[in-house]
Amino acid sequence: MVMFMHLMELPREVLLGEDLKDKVSQVAKRLKLGENVLILYGPKTKEIAGKDIEKHLKEFFHVKNLLIKEASMKNVQKALEIIRNENIDWLLGVGGGSIIDVAKLASFKADVPFISFPTTASHDGIASANASIRDLGAKTSIKARPPVAVIADVNIIKTAPYRYLAAGVGDMVSNLTAVKDWELAHRIRGEYFSEYAASLSLMSAKMVIKNADIIRLSNEESVRKVIKALISSGVAMSIAGSSRPASGAEHLFSHALDAIAPKPALHGEQCGVGTIIMAYLHGLNWKKIRETLKRVGAPTNAYELEIDPGFIIEALTIAHTIRPERYTILGKDGLTKEAAEKAAKITGVI
């Protein structure tokens, strides 16, 4: 008899507080990660936090660094070369989504742990197992492994432009439609469904909706509210063993925009707008979702995304092709141009 086995990989430590740059070494020692570390950062995040963390780590570890500018397979390969040549035991990603995604995928391919040290709170990739990597000109979502620890310094994240925090709210409200799509796939395709993971995902969304006015204040408490929701959402995906609890048709819409729009907006911003439309298609209270995004100052239409309405329509019609195996409210054949235009107009997206 074949027995069902479900693997859940979760962060072993989550540290949320102030002035945590010197705590990375303590976490690494506690988790017995090893002596050789590769720290990844971008030009900006090196100055914001990376340089100070690196200096402190050198007191206890052998440290190598890699400066990266985008989440690409080329940069993943660069990291893998350093890991092999320098016998790296663990990685540290200091930055936003791109840096953490490269660290995440490189650690997975090399089978070494990594610590996530986010400098923005713009999406739930800071704690999830999935990496969004650009390869051959297009961004693709790749299953990897979650961080062994997440260290979120409120003081650092607070200094990022508020736009990133609002984008984090957009990524969180998308859990509402993602779970609906997951339930749909479970009923129609018999896909595995975890009630626990779905509940945790929905709780993350409800948390930011409830605290929208506090989040808009853009202070330490705002950051804490969003970060807790993002981490909970990432854990929900780890429990599910897939991105299903937090990624549905609204994410496919965002990925489609990434592929066709000359200047895409932030991931969370696009997902938030996509959620308004997908909530309408699901028969959910899309007006409440739109109101939440307005309350936190996130985009709710094409003009605020600074994307031509034509690309919104096109993205809606091709979204179902981004991941054909992922069943959503868009169905197997997707939306017609007429249906896409109607949904976007009714919801005020165009």
Swiss-Prot record:
Belongs to the glycerol-1-phosphate dehydrogenase family. Pathway: Membrane lipid metabolism; glycerophospholipid metabolism. The keyword Lipid metabolism applies. Catalyzes the NAD(P)H-dependent reduction of dihydroxyacetonephosphate (DHAP or glycerone phosphate) to glycerol 1-phosphate (G1P). The G1P thus generated is used as the glycerophosphate backbone of phospholipids in the cellular membranes of Archaea. Substrate binds at residues 124, 171, 255. This is Glycerol-1-phosphate dehydrogenase [NAD(P)+]. Its EC number is 1.1.1.261. Keywords: Cytoplasm, Lipid biosynthesis, Lipid metabolism, Metal-binding, NAD, NADP, Oxidoreductase, Phospholipid biosynthesis, Phospholipid metabolism, Zinc. The gene is egsA. It catalyses: sn-glycerol 1-phosphate + NAD(+) = dihydroxyacetone phosphate + NADH + H(+); sn-glycerol 1-phosphate + NADP(+) = dihydroxyacetone phosphate + NADPH + H(+). Coiled coil: none annotated. InterPro entries: G1P_dehydrogenase_arc, G1PDH, Glycerol_DH.
